Regions:
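Membrane-proximal, glycine/serine-rich, low-complexity loop/turn segments characteristic
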Residues: 3, 9-307, 320-359, 403-424, ...
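Extracytoplasmic loops and strand-loop junctions of Gram-negative outer membrane beta-barrel proteins
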Residues: 71-72, 126-130, 201-207, 260-267, ...
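Transmembrane beta-strand segments that form the barrel wall of outer-membrane beta-barrel proteins
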Residues: 124-135, 159-161, 485-489, 553, ...
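Conserved C-terminal beta-signal and adjacent last beta-strands/turns
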Residues: 663-684, 696-798
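Face-selective signature of the C-terminal outer-membrane beta-barrel domain
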Residues: 229-240, 275-305, 319-495, 577-586, ...
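Conserved small-residue
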Residues: 585, 589-618
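Outer-membrane beta-barrel translocator domains and adjoining extracellular loop/strand segments
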Residues: 102-103, 170-176, 246-262, 306-314, ...
């Protein structure tokens, strides 16, 4: 015997800004999807929304073998890619999609993940198909989930399907509106923040992907094709249909309400139907290292209906119907050119077309309690009930473009010049009408808002800007000071009157990076921004936000100015897997757009009007996590603190609203190969609100435990339990528990079939609670959820 050579693959390796995790070094055998793999990795988290977080930052790009996987969101990947296909997980910090710009731009907030597949999964179809069934008191349960993947150097094809009525949400309405498709605004760092608004009226969102009843149909396909080395073509298509039943009981405490009125208790039963569609196409042409041309197009189309039966202790029974069929088309053209070693050019342009048409209808049976509002709106009182409606349409057309030039002075410094523009046009039309008993429709004449129940307004925005930034590396520090000069031109035309606002402004910014060690960084960022609101805030005619909230805009609104300071710290020790991040953010807004609210005499129905506040609004947030591995144990503590203070006027009286939320979490997790693994967690939340003369404080205590075990190498047992105590300063308002469990069998890890029995909500909990605050009220909500479901499933592995 001459020698013994021990070959060992490091669980984690660091190369520059890239962390590479060897998945099998952390897997325990109970993993079934990418989400399970990522949860095992130190420094990587899956948040409550199902998104991947690294260094406390949400990861928006996930690739497989370097190819985009439904660009713009990581949830589809984590919930669907099978765990047995994952070889390596590469975390790419300071990620730049354009290699030519990697050395001249700061990308500290850009983190991407690339999944490397195992050799047996390349050039072959892989994935699984799951089918399941069960029974409940209400109806029969079903589940079909095909997930198919193919990867080769030339092309890739992925298909994900999901049809179920057991509440497993593949793609929610919230996911749809948060799905960026990978688009980033060229002016995102210019200092201008322009809102196009969100013109949904009041569609309810699922809480923690739970509701009283959820039916889902989902299909998505993603592809990439490289016909030659210089050309890449890709895209995806997504369709989702969901039918949801929601039930809520809410107690509302108003900040300032007319004398003699009690707080409000409401009950609502809501039916929703959502059809959501999305289509994206991308092309990238790179003939050589000095040229790169990109074109992307993303189309969104949806059709949503919400029918709500609402009962108020103050306003009686109300039937509300809301529908909307919006669409948008976004396209971008980017070209990057490297002239030589010291001169780089980049052109980015993005064009957005958006059309929204929300419709609202409310039928109020209790006429007496709505009399004051009806008189203000000019409604006809000689009817059986008040049946009012509103049609609204908002059309947006925006061009966002810029030209960048970098001059590399030496190895440690460069100068960046930016010439850009934002051109935006919005058209806003709305009218309020009343349905009479004889089936005719009339348009009322209000006695408020100058007698206008209609809007026809054109809003134009223009920003021409020139920016300069200097980047210098000095030792462990990187300094990037800069300033941009903006020429703004804003106008709105309504009722034959044109209102303009033209001004010039300098906006400075500064970024300092302190690279303490190879894997330890301190980052300071300051930015001054000009904030502009959308067209709806300028429309002076009355608008129904809902039956109890009327709105009248102001044509004379001006922009707001904000100062933002952010300090972040990150450290990773690959020897004991100590992971630390901390982030502090402070924001101060001057001349911010706030509302003055007037309650209709004798009711809690109010009319709000925006104005530029003379008082500064402030917010301060801090969050951090410390995580360390001790052998087979991984411990972590995390805190999130958010404080905000803003000013408004209610009943002609100034009101200072303060909110302070705190969430603390401690977690202990094991990582055994053969023994069962346990994840213990305790979450403690405080929601403290001071709204004018009123103050409320709510507490939530949530211990939880998760157990997963591989038994006899064939059985996988998983269970999770959480207990929630929701209280105020005087009493416990509600306690609720959730317990889920599953037991699956497969002959071995290479078996084609796996059989599983799964139970959700074993304790048959019927509701959960949460608190929330708005600018005029604080509310505590009881939210009803699905009952106990037990299903049997069969999974076939390709």
């Amino acid at each position: 015997l001459d020698e013994v050579e021990l070959v060992y693959e490091m669980p984690v390796t660091i190369s520059g800004d890239t962390l590479v995790y060897n998945a099998d070094s952390f897997n325990t055998g109970t993993e079934r999807k990418l989400e399970d793999v990522l949860k095992n990795l130190p420094g990587v988290e899956i948040n409550d929304d199902g998104q991947v977080e690294v260094e406390g930052k949400v990861v928006n790009k996930l690739m497989v073998e370097g190819k985009d996987f439904f660009d713009g969101d990581t949830k589809l990947a984590t919930k669907n890619i099978p765990s047995n296909a994952v070889d390596k997980v590469q975390v790419l910090k300071n990620y730049s999609e354009v290699s030519q710009l990697g050395g001249v731009t700061n990308n500290q907030d850009n983190i991407a993940i690339n999944i490397k597949l195992k050799e047996g999964k390349k050039n072959f179809w892989f994935g699984n198909i799951t089918a399941g069934a069960g029974d409940s008191k209400a109806n029969s349960l079903y589940l079909v989930q095909p997930k198919l993947f193919y990867y080769s150097p030339e092309y890739s094809v992925n298909f994900i399907g999901d049809i179920n009525n057991i509440g497993e949400v593949a793609f929610s309405r919230r996911d749809y509106f948060n799905f960026s498709g990978g688009f980033q605004s060229p002016s995102r760092s210019s200092g201008t923040n322009l809102s196009l608004g969100n013109n949904d009226i009041g569609f309810l969102l699922l809480q923690n992907n739970r509701a009283k009843d959820i039916n889902t149909k989902f299909g998505a396909a993603n592809f990439s094709w490289s016909p030659k080395k210089t050309l890449d073509i890709g895209g995806f298509a997504i369709f989702s249909n969901s039918k949801n039943e929601l039930q809520e009981n809410r107690s509302v405490q108003y900040t300032v309400a007319p004398a003699g009125l009690a707080d409000e208790d409401t009950q609502s039963n809501t039916s929703q139907n959502n059809d959501l569609g999305m289509l994206k196409l991308t092309t990238k042409y790179q003939p050589n290292a000095n040229n790169q041309l990109e074109y992307e197009a993303l189309g969104n189309l949806s059709k949503s209906t919400q029918d709500q039966r609402f009962n108020s202790s103050l306003n009686g029974s109300i039937d509300q119907l809301e529908t909307t069929n919006p669409y948008s088309f976004n396209q971008s053209l980017n070209y990057y050119y490297t002239l030589n070693e010291t001169n780089i050019f980049a052109f980015e342009a993005q064009h957005l077309i958006k059309d929204e048409d929300p419709f609202y209808n409310a039928i109020l049976e209790d006429k007496a309690n709505y009399e004051g509002t009806a008189n203000s709106l000019g409604l006809d009182g000689a009817q059986l009930d008040y049946n009012l409606g509103q049609e609204k349409r908002v059309q947006s057309n925006q061009l966002d473009a810029k030209l960048d030039y970098w001059n590399i002075l030496n190895k440690k410094s460069n100068i960046n010049l930016t010439l850009g523009t934002i051109l935006s046009h919005q058209q806003f039309d709305s009218h309020i009408f009343q349905f009479l008993d004889n089936q005719t429709e009339v348009r009322p004449t209000p006695v408020i808002a100058n007698g206008a129940a209609t809007n026809d307004i054109a809003y134009n925005f223009s920003d021409m800007y020139l920016g300069v930034h200097y980047r210098l590396k000095s030792g462990k520090f990187t300094f990037t000071p800069g300033v941009s000069a903006h020429a703004y031109a804003i106008s709105n035309r309504q009722t034959g009157v044109k209102t303009t606002d033209n001004f010039f402004r300098f906006l400075p910014d500064m970024n300092v990076i302190f690279q303490i060690k190879k894997s330890e960084t301190l980052n300071l960022n300051y930015r001054m921004q000009t904030q502009f609101t959308d067209v709806s805030q300028f429309a002076s005619g009355l608008v129904l936000n809902n039956y109890n909230s009327l709105f009248s805009g102001s044509p004379d609104l001006q922009s707001a100015l904000s100062h933002n300071v952010n300090l972040s710290y990150y450290s990773f020790n690959m020897f004991n897997y100590t992971n630390v991040f901390a982030n502090i953010n402070y924001n101060k807004s001057i001349d911010n757009v706030r509302t003055v609210s007037q309650f209709v005499p004798g009711s809690v129905i109010r009319v709000s009007t925006p104005f530029n506040s003379n008082f500064a609004d402030e917010s301060l947030s801090a969050n951090g996590r410390f995580q360390r591995t001790f052998g087979k144990l991984r411990a972590s503590v995390r805190a999130n603190l958010n404080y905000s203070k803003f000013n408004q006027f209610i009943q002609d009286r100034p009101s200072v609203n303060e909110s302070f939320s705190q969430t603390y979490r401690a977690q202990l997790r094991t990582n055994f190969r053969t023994a069962p693994n346990v994840d213990l967690s305790y979450r403690y939340s405080i929601q403290d609100n001071n709204l004018g003369p009123n103050s409320t404080k709510f507490f939530t205590k949530s211990p939880s435990i998760e157990v997963d075990a591989l038994i006899l190498k064939s059985f996988t047992f998983k269970t999770d339990y959480s207990y929630n105590d929701f209280s105020d300063e005087d009493r416990t308002i509600n306690t609720y528990e959730f317990w889920n469990a599953s037991l699956s069998y497969r002959k071995d890890e290479d078996a084609k079939f796996e059989y599983e029995i799964r139970a959700t909500n074993l304790l048959d909990t019927r509701s959960q609670n949460q608190s929330s605050a708005s600018n005029i009220s604080v509310s505590a909500t009881e939210y009803f959820i699905q009952p106990r479901y037990v299903t049997f499933r069969v999974r076939y592995e390709l």
